[in-house]
């Protein structure tokens, strides 16, 4: 049996024991955050479904760019009284930014997040910087995983379990120190068909955002003319 990625094993254990895992995967753009999240999901599907190979698991990997789409999916699970092993919010800061804390949907999502474990064993967020996410999500991110290159030439990245230690200086002042523990090494590469579908879906969301930006700018121009 193939070895699972570290985070995948945590999720499998949570799924089988009615537990819950929350993870924020972050790092510079282009280092393989999304790839790591997808490969974790692949390993989870492979293990839970008892598949022969990990390649078979790619067809079951699910992810979301938008909160409304994800909530529709969770509502369907609730209506059917089902529970799934994970849900992935890719580029989570688009909808779940700390700058949107005052919006009604964020307040409602904050309330529901305490109950989400009933339907999902793990919530995975990807973002360039964890500080961009709403505080209540960062606070509840049990695992913060930083992704960096191990060998850019060979397209090998490493996932580091990120933690902050608190200490006191000789003068009694509090200081923080970041620690990083390597948990996984992986190839930043996805199957062609899966990657093509991901790029297509991502492009659709990019165009939607650009349309929203243009609409906002046009409204501003109209106000300036009045």
Question: Which functions belong to the PLM regions below?
Answer:
Residues 23-25:
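Hydrophobic anchor at the beta1->P-loop junction of P-loop NTPases
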Residues 145, 156-226:
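Conserved P-loop NTPase motor module
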Residues 33:
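Conserved lysine of the Walker
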Residues 61-123:
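Conserved nucleotide-sensing/catalytic segment adjacent to the nucleotide-binding pocket
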Residues 42-62:
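Post-Walker A helix-loop "phosphate-sensing" segment adjacent to the P-loop in P-loop NTPases
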Residues 36:
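Hydrophobic positions on the alpha1 helix immediately C-terminal to the Walker A/P-loop
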Residues 1-17:
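Pre-Walker A adenine-sensing motif
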